[in-house]
């Protein structure tokens, strides 16, 4: 006998019935984190002229796991995950730290070294990630190198989150112009968000990741869109000292805010006041050149 999908999810993820049936679902912590080259021995940095990248050191990996443990997110979007075997290593380490993630998404697009990924304590009930997104630049065909992560997560009965992840072109120079590449990627990302919002204006949509642009730059404004019913709000995160930067670019000695969590109007009203944060600790830089951004959602079953 085939079980209905809802009860199959209960069995597969060993979730108590009450957790999914509750009128007021539990609070959900969402986070985005560029873990800086979670790569293995054979990785090659395509964006840096083919120079071979160093594998991520054990000390750095341990620090990454500790940072995630400190935040303890329920849903974590990851940038710069390495090859599939590195993602398996990442998952094992998170499990060993007692973090208890039960479902996963991993995007294999054009960039063979750096991938988007997601870990979740809640079941993923739909996978819509895009791995082959094309555009034309100066008469030449181009692709979004990391693709776009896109999943639907079932938080409770009648309550889902649509999570889109992105890692736009870095600021490292390219012949075609890195800013133009990044803006085209942002345009395509916004097109994807518009399609989601057009299909369901009440969708609880979050878009998170490393966007490699500041708030006053074109790519950022492409993603937020025009003020109105489809505007994607960037959550105003800061750390306990009031700092908002999320990346330290050592080569330029530059601190910047380039990692964001954007939310749709329907989800914005469910963000816990004061919860958006930028992570800070004494060992953040041992782990990565980025700091995670996270926020708490207080779900409501109202339409």
Annotate each language-model stretch with its function.
Residues 2, 20-97, 103, 108-113, ...:
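N-terminal, active-site-proximal structural segment of metallo-dependent hydrolase catalytic domains
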Residues 7-19:
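Bacterial N-terminal signal peptides
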Residues 27-40, 130, 160-170:
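Active-site-proximal beta-strand elements of phosphoester/diester hydrolases
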Residues 81-160, 166:
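Structured beta-strand-rich core segments of catalytic domains in phosphoester-bond hydrolases
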């Amino acid at each position: 006998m085939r079980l209905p999908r809802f009860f199959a999810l209960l069995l597969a993820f060993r979730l108590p019935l009450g957790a999914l049936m509750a009128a007021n679902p539990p609070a959900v912590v969402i986070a985005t984190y560029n873990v800086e080259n979670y790569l293995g021995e054979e990785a090659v940095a395509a964006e840096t002229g083919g120079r071979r990248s160093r594998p991520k050191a054990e000390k750095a990996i341990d620090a990454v796991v500790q940072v995630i443990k400190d935040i303890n997110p329920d849903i974590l979007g990851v940038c710069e995950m390495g090859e599939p075997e590195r993602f398996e290593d990442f998952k094992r380490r998170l499990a060993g730290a007692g973090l208890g993630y039960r479902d996963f998404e991993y995007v294999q697009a054009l960039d063979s070294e750096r991938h988007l990924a997601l870990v979740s304590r809640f079941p993923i009930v739909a996978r819509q990630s895009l791995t082959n997104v094309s555009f034309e630049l100066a008469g030449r065909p181009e692709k979004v190198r990391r693709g776009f992560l896109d999943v639907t997560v079932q938080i409770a009965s009648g309550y889902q989150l649509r999570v889109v992840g992105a890692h736009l072109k870095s600021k490292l120079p390219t012949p075609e112009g890195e800013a133009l590449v990044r803006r085209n990627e942002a345009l395509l990302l916004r097109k994807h968000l518009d399609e989601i919002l057009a299909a369901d204006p009440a969708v609880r949509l979050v878009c998170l990741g490393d966007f490699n642009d500041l708030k006053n730059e074109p790519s950022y404004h492409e993603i937020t869109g025009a003020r109105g019913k489809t505007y994607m709000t960037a959550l105003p995160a800061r750390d306990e000292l009031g700092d908002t930067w999320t990346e330290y670019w050592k080569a330029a000695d530059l601190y910047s805010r380039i990692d964001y969590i954007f939310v749709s109007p329907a989800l914005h009203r469910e963000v816990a006041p004061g919860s958006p944060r930028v992570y800070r600790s004494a060992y953040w830089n041992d782990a990565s050149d980025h700091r995670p951004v996270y926020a708490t959602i207080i779900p409501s079953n109202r339409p």
